[in-house]
Amino acid sequence: MADKKKITASLIYAVSVAAIGSLQFGYNTGVINAPEKIIQAFYNRTLSQRSGETISPELLTSLWSLSVAIFSVGGMIGSFSVSLFFNRFGRRNSMLLVNVLAFAGGALMALSKIAKAVEMLIIGRFIIGLFCGLCTGFVPMYISEVSPTSLRGAFGTLNQLGIVVGILVAQIFGLEGIMGTEALWPLLLGFTIVPAVLQCVALLFCPESPRFLLINKMEEEKAQTVLQKLRGTQDVSQDISEMKEESAKMSQEKKATVLELFRSPNYRQPIIISITLQLSQQLSGINAVFYYSTGIFERAGITQPVYATIGAGVVNTVFTVVSLFLVERAGRRTLHLVGLGGMAVCAAVMTIALALKEKWIRYISIVATFGFVALFEIGPGPIPWFIVAELFSQGPRPAAMAVAGCSNWTSNFLVGMLFPYAEKLCGPYVFLIFLVFLLIFFIFTYFKVPETKGRTFEDISRGFEEQVETSSPSSPPIEKNPMVEMNSIEPDKEVA
């Protein structure tokens, strides 16, 4: 089988370098939590010296909330701007260019203490948010386009692995014994410059996406050379043939704008699936679990809950690796269903444990917490990011990634803003809200989400088109082909 290529050093190198962008996203998501009190003291001291008056607790809380939330605002804008870069500059060059934002944001945050400027830190967080928003679109798309069909899901999971490793590194670096101190917190925030430098240098030796070269730039010879290097074989005729077929189809289609994704019947179902899967990630309650984890561990008698939280981060990382090996065996749809269903059970257990407050059940709540995190990384964590790239052909893919990424960042922002109020109103029963969401997303996934394992981009797109033709009253009914049956739990056989 032509798709059963060996895993080459060039392929591993390309996807690993791209995943540094995901690591940046994870690091900058988690880095702000540990030094919260130290940075608030910096805000208080700096603004008091500047105004000559004591800063009110309300203003301090508002400034801190802004510092946290502005990252997501930047992410929303950045993720929605993905399509402006990818077709103009290419996949690799886009990742290279946006590291300028990482340098600027990291420098502003690192120098904010010396400059005694609270504004620098907040603006730096916004710029880093822009950068991370762009990365959440660039990385999964690049990885999906350089990977062979049979390994696309496994390598796509590296995007989520980069995110969770970044969060774990931020948690560890944020410990008081490392960089979570009054003297070193600017370095903790500015450390994001280091992986940016590494990625800039490494990207110079990465190939451009062969799909971009052939389909967008019409440079078949370059695409063939890149494919031969990535696949470790001279015979890449099947890949070239599949790309040419997709290119021919793309030339007959209207330009895929964001509005066209919702107007066109062929794109409407995949974009709704893409948005819903992104919402299933953010509305699953994973952020609430991390919010509650310290309290859960404290009630269980753990004297250093911060280390238990890091333990949850380790579980996060380990089960992302597990997902990497499972996704090409079990399939995307199955793992997403297992993750959502298992998380719903864990959410119910955590609700009971938090409500009863019995000593014996505290330890069950810890198991449920770790189980919730593990199941998140089996399905809802990694799959929504890379399945979007699989559901669309080359033309609409950048616009689809922009819409999906923006919906993820927007829901992340809303959960962050609204969760404290929901927690105050519902107390330990707040997880029931997420339980309802998990069940809704489980039902949606079961009935609407296709299995994409082992299928080419063109085959998946054709499946949606045939569904539209089947459901259209003006079109005669067509016989469903197992290769394009969109709601089948069983994955299709790999393309020979």
Curated annotation (Swiss-Prot):
SUPFAM superfamilies: MFS general substrate transporter (SSF103473). GO terms for molecular function: D-glucose binding; D-glucose transmembrane transporter activity; galactose transmembrane transporter activity. Pfam families: Sugar_tr. GO terms for biological process: D-glucose import; D-glucose transmembrane transport; dehydroascorbic acid transport; galactose transmembrane transport. Deoxyglucose transport is inhibited by D-glucose, D-galactose and maltose. Galactose transport is inhibited by D-glucose and maltose. The chain crosses the membrane at residues 12-33, 66-86, 92-112, 120-143, 155-175, 185-205, 271-291, 306-326, 333-353, 363-388, 399-419, 429-449. GO terms for cellular component: cell projection; extracellular space; membrane; perikaryon; plasma membrane. Residues 464-496 are annotated as: Disordered. It comes from the Eukaryota. Residues 278-280 are annotated as: Important for selectivity against fructose. Residues 1-11, 87-91, 144-154, 206-270, 327-332, 389-398, 450-496 are cytoplasmic. Residues 34-65, 113-119, 176-184, 292-305, 354-362, 420-428 are extracellular. Signal peptide: none annotated. Glycans are attached at residue 44. D-glucose binds at residues 160, 281-282, 287, 316, 377, 385. It is a multi-pass membrane protein. PANTHER family: SOLUTE CARRIER FAMILY 2, SOLUTE CARRIER FAMILY 2, FACILITATED GLUCOSE TRANSPORTER MEMBER 3. Facilitative glucose transporter. Can also mediate the uptake of various other monosaccharides across the cell membrane. Mediates the uptake of glucose, 2-deoxyglucose, galactose, mannose, xylose and fucose, and probably also dehydroascorbate. Does not mediate fructose transport. Required for mesendoderm differentiation. Transport is mediated via a series of conformation changes, switching between a conformation where the substrate-binding cavity is accessible from the outside, and a another conformation where it is accessible from the cytoplasm. NCBIfam families: SP. This is Solute carrier family 2, facilitated glucose transporter member 3. It comes from Gallus gallus.
